[in-house]
Amino acid sequence: LLDAKSWHDRAMTPQDLHALVDYNYWATHRLLAAVDALTPEQFVRDLASSFRSVRDTLTHVHDAEWIWLSRLHGVSPTSRLPLDRFEDCAALRAGWAETQGGLRTYVDGLDDAGVQRVVEYRLLNGSSSADRAWHLVQHVVNHGTYHRGQVTTMLRQLGAAPPLPLDLVAYYRERRG
């Protein structure tokens, strides 16, 4: 195992980050396909989760991706977007498409130096922080994975069919053919 400093200094490649971002949206699209089957009432039903409903949880993930993408571009948002801004899954998907395209474009434009670049930003509470670009992109993907698991549980609570497998290895297998 690498010690903490060695691990922190070891960079992913631009290709590694591209694969992770591609996986992130592959899994998100699979999840949204399952969410499409929900009724409008199910989409917003309070399930007493971290974020009350399927809509609120997915909106939170989209919002977080938008915030991190903004920070990667040197802009630090000072507030979150409202969780109730999407009426249905179609509106959520449309709103997410721009952020998805932005993150893909950002990662596609990275070279080795860009991957290692230290990004300085402010948290929503106003405190400052700085992290390498590849750490932030990894965080976006990991955050999405965490909440996709929550939404999968919510779908089961609602009696809806869970999504197709969302595992990273399933993504690699599918890409391999």
Region annotations inferred by a language model:
Residues D112-V118, A161-P165:
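A short coil-to-beta-strand element that immediately follows conserved catalytic motifs
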Residues V75-Q116:
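Helix-adjacent hinge/juxtasegments
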Residues L1-L2:
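Leucine-biased recognition of intrinsically disordered, low-complexity hydrophobic segments
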Residues H18-P82, L123-G177:
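Short, contiguous alpha-helical
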